[in-house]
């Protein structure tokens, strides 16, 4: 999953920065935010094992939102109301807000997103287009577990039957 995005970035760029941030503005249900896996120490070990030169940026909520945890409203030409957006109003405003903020802080030439979250990939592309940020958004193929399930940090919440 995410390690494959890093591998691609390492192959195509002189410097790779990985952001790790659980964004509160993406969660409609506060319980989902509390249950979301947070494994920063493990993640940093995996990243260092992949390549010790990767820069890890793991800001706090305060670093990002400076005391005001609010998402910026975006017009994604209606894409935010389709598919997942039908069931999670405001979710993609949260996505747009955090990705825009991270792009402003890091100033990447290239940003890599998995095609597993295809609607999110389209949303990020639309946000970059509308805000005229100078970032090349690159979609990367889905990586799967040996049983065919798409790799995801949320998989740890599933049991064998699911």
Per-region residue spans from a language model:
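Nucleotidyltransferase catalytic core that binds NTPs
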Residues: 1-162
